[in-house]
Amino acid sequence: MRRFTVTCILLVSATAAFVGTSWHATAAGQQVSRPPSPAPTPTPTARRAIRPDKFPNTGLPYSPGILAGDTLYLSGQLGRDPATAMLVPGGIDAETRQALVNLGEVLKAAGMDFRNVVSVTAFISDFKDFQRFNAVYREFFSTDPPARATVQVAGLNLGAAVEIQMIAVR
């Protein structure tokens, strides 16, 4: 009895190019290598809410900070007195100082300080106060200040003069 070997020729070149595979000759015949398995779905980074003990409870649905891996995202803070949750008197100078003190408490609760801050976004209600804002800001970031954007806005909660948010990295 005769043996017949049937060889099927598959048109795979277009498919191989499409999926990034190629033909490989082997001793047993020809085979198509398989595309690499997709990368495993990354596990979401663990995140932890950061809420300092001495911090104004505004009753609003947000966390003062979220620590995700080595990155701390700090919510925008007004110059609120932690004891009363009201704006401190004294205009943009006092509000800027208190907002930065409040942000410092969030940094501290996450085991960081102002040296860990890599980005700041400041919202001010009137650019005529820009230089006064900068004077207080320099007290906290005197050398190697982080990247920053300062934006004038039409209004802030409670009629505040300034709101500051940050990102810090360990």
Predicted regions and their residues:
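N-terminal presequence-like segments and the immediate start of the first folded domain
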Residues: 3-101, 105-118, 124-170
